[in-house]
A protein has these predicted regions:
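Structured alpha/beta or helical-core interaction and ligand-binding surfaces enriched in interleaved
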Residues: 1-129, 133-200
Length: 200
């Protein structure tokens, strides 16, 4: 059965399937949670240096411990977009080794890893839906298929099973006593900075 992060709950998880589809401007993938870490690590190994990390962090008043989400693009949560720029591969792996556990488990935040040089980006969104972005996005079909994730014209992601009668739930969680907000404060010591506020 499709696995989800501990910070999210979806209705009818039995309906959700792994797979990917090509969309306008994005390669979208539904990745079961137990595979997501390996896919991210391999993406880091493939993209060109230098790299950057982007974090989308809900403002505290929007980060409830049980936030209902009805589907893609719904909700009225504002989030702070933050960046850690000009990372080498070694530096990005160090950041991910330290904070990847909370990035993956948390339900209320989103994150992306990308190349400054090529623009290739892996954006891990709410419910851990993955979008590969950039002109080279289609090359990552091979990465997905290596992990048993194949094209699907009728792909059902977590977003596709949500509605107002059956919302998903996104939660702020702790991993080893650390929340995403704690991780942000620690990453500021390494150069993480705020770039602006957007509405989710």
């Amino acid at each position: 059965m499709f696995q989800t992060a501990i910070g999210v709950t979806i209705p009818f998880p039995e309906k959700v399937r792994e797979g990917y589809r090509i969309m306008d401007g994005a390669l979208r993938a539904s990745v079961s949670f137990e595979k997501l870490d390996a896919v991210i690590r391999e993406f880091i190994s493939l993209i060109e240096e230098p790299m950057f990390l982007a974090l989308h962090i809900p403002l505290p008043e929007g980060a409830t411990e049980d936030m209902s989400v009805y589907g893609e693009g719904t909700g009225s949560v504002y989030e702070q977009v933050m960046y850690l720029d000009q990372c080498s591969r070694e530096q990005m792996l160090s950041v991910y080794n330290t904070f990847g556990g909370i990035f993956l488990a948390d339900g209320v935040s989103q994150f992306a890893i990308a190349s400054h040089k090529s623009g290739d980006e892996m954006f891990v969104q709410l419910f851990k839906i993955v979008d590969f972005l950039g002109e080279g996005r289609l090359r990552y079909t091979a990465l997905l298929e290596k992990h048993g994730i194949y094209p699907s014209d009728g792909l059902l992601t977590a977003w596709d099973v949500l509605d107002k009668e059956h919302p998903g739930k996104c939660r702020l969680v702790k991993v080893l006593g650390t929340t995403i907000f704690d991780a942000v404060e620690r990453l500021k010591e390494f150069g993480l900075y705020a770039a602006g506020v957007i509405e989710r």
